Amino acid sequence: SLVTLSHTAGQAWAHEGMPPARRTALVAVASTLGIIVPPSLVLLLLGDAMLRAHTEGLTLATQLGLASAHAGTRIINTQDVLQAALAPGALLLVLWMGVTWWLAQRRTGGIADQGAASSAPVPLTRGERWTLGVVPTLIVALLALVTTGRVRAVEAAATAGVLLLVWGVASRQLTLRRLAQVLDDAMALTGALFALLVAAVTFSLVLRAYGTDALVAEWMRALQGQPLLAMGVVLSVLLGSAFVLDAFELIFLIIPIVMPPLLALVDDAAWVAALTLLVLQAGFLLPPLGYALVLSRAQVAPRPAMGAVARALAPYLLCLAGVIALVMTVPATTQWLRSTPATLPEMSIQGDDLDALMREMSHPEAPAPAPAASATPP
C-alpha cells in the first residue's frame, strides 16, 4: 500500500508542489488505514489469532479459578472483530479526512503557492468514468454486506476478485502479461505469509518451551483485579514492538504470548482487539522509528527532515490518540454495531426439564407394526 501510494498519489502531490514532509506524512497515514478499516487482511489475521488466544485465555482462567471463567463469555470470531473495529475505524477516518481538508484549506506549508506551475487536469474518458462509478459502488456494497454479517470477509474478497477479473476482460484492460504479473505477486505474498507464519509459530514454540508463556501468565496474574492496568501493559508492549516488527510478525509472534493471559482477565475480547489495532497503527506512525514512517521517508526525494515530518504528523497522531482514549474509556463504542453479545445468556435447566429435553433429542422408537387384516372369504 505504501509503495503504491508513493508512486501514484505521492508523485502527483510532488508535481503540485506539496512539500516532502507533508507528502511523507500523508503517504504514511493513508497506508496504515488498512489496519483498522474493515475488512483488512491485518484485521482478518488478528481475528483468527484472537480466537485462539481467547480460547487459551478462558482455559487459563478456569485453571486459575478466575471470575472470568464463570462469566459465560462467548468465544469471539473474525466477524466480532470486524464489527467491533468498524465504529472506531470510521471515526478515525472522518477525523483524518477533516484534518487533511483543513490543512489543504490553510495552505500553510502545504500545496504549492498560487504562482506555482500546474498542468490542467486531463479529462476522463468514457471508460474511466464508468470504472470510477462502478468500482467504488462495488466496494461499498461488499463492505456493507460484510458489516451486516450477510457474507464473510473471505467470501467478499473472493467475489471482488472474480468480478475484477470479469471487469478486466470486459474492458479489455486485462492482458495475459498483466494477469501473469498479478498471479506472480499474489503467490509471492501468499508464500511470504506462510513462511512468516511457520517461522513465527516455531519461534513461539521455542519461547514456550523455555516457559515464557507461563512467566507472562504469572505476571498478568499479579494484576488480577486491575484489568485496565493489565491492558495498558500489554498495549505498551505491542506499541514498542510495532517499532521493529510489521503487523504480520506482531500477530503471529507477539499476540499468542501476551493475549491469552490478558483475555483471562478481560471479558470483552473484541474490545481488546479493536484497541490492539489502534495501538498497532500508532506504533507504525510514531516518529522516529515508526515502521510506515521510515518506509515512507525512503520513498520521498529529497528525503525530508524528521522534525518536519513529525510536525506534519502531529494533527493525525492527536486524532489517533483521541480515538484510542475514547475506545479505552468507553468500551461501548465497539459494541454499537455488533450483532452478537460478548457473553452468553444465563440458562438454568432443572433435572426434569433436562430429562424431557434429552428424550426429545433422542431417536423416536419405531412404531409397532399394524396387525395383518384377516382375510375374508370370497
How should these model regions be labeled?
Residues 1-378:
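Alpha-helical transmembrane segments of multi-pass membrane transport proteins
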